[in-house]
């Protein structure tokens, strides 16, 4: 039991440290103009700043985003199947198996996260015409983020064996569904834009009021997941998502403004706030 507790504490500390440190790092970079090139998101303007030459040599196609979603969409069910169909005497594996079998909360979280990543995989595969580039570091961070989020979901389900979901968890499930529908609708507009030979001004749906509604959709999805999980570790995940979406939506808004040359006011990410 002591070994199990040590492993749990170590994993909990590592995952918490990852999300805390990366969130702080992104926050610092966003407020450090000379380092803002590290935040350069494929296809977005970098507020007029050019990255060092070596950074341009360490870029990969932005369409490789689909690799993250394929990876986590396979990891989730394969890990679950592996744990449920093996009988390792190692305490930590036995405990995870019990959680997967008896924690309704964990079962729901892994299911909706699988649905989310499969949807994002489908959308990204349809986005593969993009010729934009992203920093190789962002590519590696993608794998780290989804791996750590998966670990966070497993950790928050430890010995959480409630038979029924609370009213707040049902609210979270509804928010997750709204966020998924919102984000998918936004991505469909973006996919339609990509299929045009010339830049298409997006003014339909949520794009009437918000420059980057697809980024807001990501925040809504993870807010729903956090309400279902009801664990402080998932709130750290949401904090990372919020910080990252604010940074990305800022550069995206700059890109859209330069391409559209429009005087119409739209919120960047969150209506009435930003």
Swiss-Prot record:
The keyword Transmembrane helix applies. The chain crosses the membrane at residues 9-29, 64-84, 135-155, 165-185, 219-239. It is a multi-pass membrane protein. It is found in: Endoplasmic reticulum membrane. Belongs to the steroid 5-alpha reductase family. Its main location: endoplasmic reticulum. One of its GO terms (molecular function) is polyprenol reductase activity. This is Uncharacterized protein C7D4.09c. PANTHER family: DFG10 PROTEIN, POLYPRENOL REDUCTASE. The keyword Zinc-finger does not apply. GO terms for biological process: dolichol biosynthetic process; dolichol-linked oligosaccharide biosynthetic process. It holds the Pfam family Steroid_dh. InterPro entries: 3-oxo-5_a-steroid_4-DH_C (IPR001104), Dfg10/SRD5A3 (IPR039698). GO terms for cellular component: endoplasmic reticulum; endoplasmic reticulum membrane. Keywords: Endoplasmic reticulum, Membrane, Transmembrane, Transmembrane helix.
């Amino acid at each position: 039991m002591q070994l199990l507790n040590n492993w749990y504490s170590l994993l909990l500390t590592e995952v918490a440290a990852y999300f805390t440190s990366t969130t702080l790092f992104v926050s610092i970079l966003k407020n450090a103009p000379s380092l803002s090139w590290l935040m350069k998101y494929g296809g977005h303007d970098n507020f007029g700043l050019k990255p060092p030459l070596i950074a341009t040599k360490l870029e990969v196609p932005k369409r490789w985003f689909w690799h993250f979603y394929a990876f986590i969409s396979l990891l989730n069910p394969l890990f679950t199947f592996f744990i449920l169909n093996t009988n390792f005497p190692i305490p930590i594996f036995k405990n995870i198996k019990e959680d997967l079998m008896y924690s309704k909360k964990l079962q729901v979280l892994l299911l909706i996260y699988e649905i989310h990543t499969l949807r994002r995989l489908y959308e990204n595969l349809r986005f593969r015409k993009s010729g934009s580039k992203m920093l190789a570091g962002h590519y590696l961070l993608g794998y780290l983020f989804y791996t750590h989020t998966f670990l966070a979901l497993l950790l928050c389900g430890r010995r959480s064996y409630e038979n029924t979901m609370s009213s707040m968890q049902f609210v979270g499930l509804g928010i997750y569904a709204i966020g998924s529908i919102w984000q998918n609708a936004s991505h469909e507009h973006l996919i339609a834009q990509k299929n045009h030979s010339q830049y298409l001004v997006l003014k339909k749906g949520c794009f009437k009021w918000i420059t980057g509604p697809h980024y807001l959709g990501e925040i809504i999805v993870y807010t729903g997941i956090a309400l279902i999980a009801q664990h402080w570790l998932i709130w750290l995940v949401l904090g990372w998502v919020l910080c990252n979406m604010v940074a990305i939506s800022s550069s995206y808004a700059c890109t859209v403004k330069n391409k559209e040359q429009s005087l119409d006011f739209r919120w960047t990410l969150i209506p009435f706030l930003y």
